[in-house]
Amino acid sequence: MSAAARGLVRLVKSYQRHLSPRKPAPTCRFTPTCSQYAVEAIERHGALKGAWLAAWRVLRCNPLVPGGCDPVPEHFPSWRGPHPKTPSRKTPE
């Protein structure tokens, strides 16, 4: 793991130890919690991609999203090109 990734993991774990217990009630809508998701994402995908996944997860942790089980993906998703469910726009030859 890179130095940047180790630093980010330490930062999240510090949040888990010192700030999270002071909240009046659990506030995360997902399992694993957003902070645990961040640690796993950074450990699995590195500092940059892991932080991106963690930020996207925190943005989704709101009352408009139902929540539930949302594990860290095994492989970093590729958003280049069309979505797999989008029909191709190629013209017939």
UniProtKB/Swiss-Prot annotation:
Membrane topology: Peripheral membrane protein
Subcellular location: Cell membrane
Protein family (similarity comment): Belongs to the UPF0161 family.
NCBIfam families documented for this protein: membrane protein insertion efficiency factor YidD (TIGR00278)
Organism the protein comes from: Deinococcus geothermalis (strain DSM 11300 / CIP 105573 / AG-3a)
Region forming the signal peptide: none
InterPro entries associated with the record: Membr_insert_effic_factor_YidD (IPR002696)
Cited function: Could be involved in insertion of integral membrane proteins into the membrane.
A Pfam family assignment: YidD
Organism domain of life: Bacteria
Disordered as annotated region, ranges: 72-93
Basic residues compositional bias, start-end: 82-93
Protein name: Putative membrane protein insertion efficiency factor
Keywords assigned by UniProt, alphabetized: Cell membrane, Membrane
Intrachain S-S bonds: none
GO CC terms, sorted: plasma membrane
